[in-house]
């Protein structure tokens, strides 16, 4: 399964690990995904993966 938010499509980013000697190694920065249940229009529930930042926005009601 892709490490991607089901609503905002946020996915992994690429960055660097930087040591004290200023050596740089590539790393992946993964989104903070949470599994939630969402109720569909027909009354059934579905489990989706949503980023924590998206979840905060949903709870604010924006």
UniProtKB/Swiss-Prot annotation:
Keywords: Ribonucleoprotein, Ribosomal protein
Keyword Ribonucleoprotein: yes
Transmembrane annotation, as ranges: none
GO MF annotations, alphabetized: structural constituent of ribosome
The keyword Translocase is assigned to this record: no
GO biological process, one term: translation
Record-linked SUPFAM superfamilies: L28p-like
GO cellular component: ribonucleoprotein complex; ribosome
InterPro entries tied to this protein: Bacterial_rp_bL28, Ribosomal_bL28, Ribosomal_bL28/bL31-like_sf, Ribosomal_bL28_bact-type, Ribosomal_bL28_sf
PANTHER family for the chain: 50S RIBOSOMAL PROTEIN L28, LARGE RIBOSOMAL SUBUNIT PROTEIN BL28A
Family classification: Belongs to the bacterial ribosomal protein bL28 family.
Protein name, per record: Large ribosomal subunit protein bL28
């Amino acid at each position: 399964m892709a490490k991607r938010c089901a609503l905002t499509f946020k996915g992994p980013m690429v960055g660097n690990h930087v040591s004290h000697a200023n050596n740089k190694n590539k790393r992946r920065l993964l989104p903070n995904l949470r599994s939630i249940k969402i109720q569909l229009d027909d009354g059934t529930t579905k489990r989706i993966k949503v980023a924590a930042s998206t979840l905060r926005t949903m709870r604010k009601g924006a």
